[in-house]
A protein has these predicted regions:
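Charge-dense, helix-prone N-terminal extensions
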Residues: 1-109
Length: 109
């Protein structure tokens, strides 16, 4: 199964306005990088987000959010948001801003 290209197109519309972003196909999906660090992407029909441990724990209490688990073992600091959780661009942009905020705390690669 491929990744949801519609979610990816919506992400690109938002992050293409940001500086220092890049995209890579990985893990059967697509990942987006900020200053060389992965911060979001699309896996199957999920938005994946790197929020850090504290940010991901806070996000897990929200509807349509679960731990990122694509290998059978949850990945700390990452979450997956179901498509129902990003039905409009404002919701998507808010999630991307959270991931961007965390990515900016990481050293550039």
């Amino acid at each position: 199964m491929g990744y949801d290209e519609e979610i990816d197109a919506r992400i690109r519309t938002i992050i293409n306005k940001w500086e220092n972003t890049a995209s890579k196909k990985m893990f059967g999906g697509v990942c987006h990088l900020l200053n060389g660090n992965m911060f979001c992407g699309v896996y199957k029909n999920f938005l994946i987000l790197r929020l850090g441990v504290q940010g991901s724990e806070e996000a897990l209490g929200r509807p349509y959010v679960k731990s990122m688990d694509i290998t059978g073992k949850p990945i700390k600091g990452w979450v997956m948001v179901q498509k129902q959780g990003i039905v409009n661009d404002e919701e998507l942009a808010a999630w991307l801003e959270r991931a961007k905020k965390y990515a900016r705390t990481l050293p550039p690669k």
